[in-house]
């Protein structure tokens, strides 16, 4: 060794920079708005706030880190909606989950007059296959074709009595 300082990658040192603006659900201001929002199936736009999360060794409310200093540390992001309790390893997955609570569906099908909306882009991509008739999975025992592998597996089990093991 030549005595030069070696710089090691320490992901826990830059943990605070990992957090982006996450929407968090805040409770309604008055009891009247609570009764009004309880009849609605989605949370109103006035109840959704965006905050910049300052994280000092994983003290942000949406992140619970396990095993500090370990390269294999896992970050669990907790949904802030009371009574939900769902956790995610990635901030983006938590953000997508929060759309379920807010009813936000930013991904819109642009196929002619369809206009269906989705809260995740992968759902939109899968939906577009219904318009294009794209069948990527074919049954080897009959002529049926499917756009999703899980539908093919369900077909094999129910029609041909074949259990597919992954």
From Swiss-Prot:
**Knockout mutant characteristics:** RNAi-mediated knockdown causes hypodermal or cuticular rupture, typically in the anterior body region. Abnormal gap between the outer layer of hypodermis and muscle and the internal organs, perhaps due to defects in cuticle integrity.
Q: Name one GO molecular function term.
A: zinc ion binding
Region Disordered, residue ranges:
17-45
Q: Is-annotated flag, keyword Transcription? A: yes
The record's annotation in PROSITE patterns points to:
ZINC_FINGER_C2H2_1 (PS00028), ZINC_FINGER_C2H2_2 (PS50157)
- Protein keywords: Metal-binding, Repeat, Transcription, Transcription regulation, Zinc, Zinc-finger
Start and end residues of each C2H2-type zinc finger? 77-101, 107-131, 137-160
Query: InterPro entries under this entry?
Result: Znf_C2H2_sf, Znf_C2H2_type
Q: Indicate the family of this protein.
A: Belongs to the Sp1 C2H2-type zinc-finger protein family.
> Which gene is this protein's source?
sptf-2
* Keyword Ribonucleoprotein among record annotations: no
Which species is this UniProt entry from? Caenorhabditis elegans
Which protein are we looking at?
A: Specificity protein transcription factor 2
Task: Tell me the classification of the organism that encodes this protein.
Answer: Eukaryota, Metazoa, Ecdysozoa, Nematoda, Chromadorea
Q: Locations of Low complexity compositional bias?
A: 31-42
An example of a Gene Ontology BP annotation on this entry?
Answer: regulation of transcription by RNA polymerase II
Q: Its biological function?
A: Transcription factor. Probably acts downstream of the Wnt signaling pathway.
One Pfam assignment: zf-C2H2
């Amino acid at each position: 060794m030549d005595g030069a300082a070696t710089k090691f990658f320490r992901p826990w040192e830059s943990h605070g920079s990992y957090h982006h603006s996450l929407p968090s659900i805040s409770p309604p201001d008055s009891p009247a708005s609570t009764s009004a929002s309880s009849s609605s199936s989605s949370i109103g736009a006035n109840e959704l706030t965006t905050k910049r999360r300052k994280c000092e060794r994983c003290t942000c409310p949406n992140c619970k880190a396990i095993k500090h200093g370990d390269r294999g540390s896992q970050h669990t992001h907790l949904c802030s909606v009371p009574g939900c309790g769902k956790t995610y390893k990635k901030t983006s997955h938590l953000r997508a989950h929060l759309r379920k609570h807010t009813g936000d569906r930013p991904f819109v099908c642009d196929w002619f007059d369809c206009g269906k909306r989705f809260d995740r882009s992968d759902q939109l991509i899968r939906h577009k296959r219904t318009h294009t008739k794209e069948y990527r999975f074919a049954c080897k025992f009959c002529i049926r074709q499917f756009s999703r592998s899980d539908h093919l597996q369900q077909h094999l089990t129910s029609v041909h009595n074949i259990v597919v093991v992954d």
